């Protein structure tokens, strides 16, 4: 039991570290563990990101454990609100779907636009359709494939001004959890993505204008990569037990 507690503690720290690192947070894992342990009062944004993500992770984990998790628009917005709390200037962007356009830049060539997501006026409709699709297919579509579909589609819709990736990764873990693959305690698939961030972005992202490519987006490559990530992480855990 002590070993399981240690694994759970380590997995949460690793998930938090990896997910914020993917988005550019420079703090090493040792610093992340220190922030989570000591919870300092006067903190920088890089530390705030860590505490926010960990809080959201704990909230979602608790919902899954108690059987209280259900994917809804309100929950998605709530989780984003926790993730970006005190990190955004405009309160309208916290815990609410975006009402402004966004552009996704190529992380390797920052002056190059990689993707133009859907118009803000369509976000509510697109997210409603995604939530309905996921909930209506629980038990019908393989849970790993269903979680992978949610992950990529939510990234494509890009419903928030900021915090999309972190929110998506948290909810993906929860979707796996309610479908019998409860990974919170020992598992961090974010760790797999963080080992090669460029590959993750290339697999989960799409390139171009949403309205020009939306009918031709292929999820197959991403789903295969997603499954490889779960397998890779399970192998890592096996070595630590």
What positions do the PLM features span?
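FIC/Doc superfamily catalytic core
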Residues: 1-241
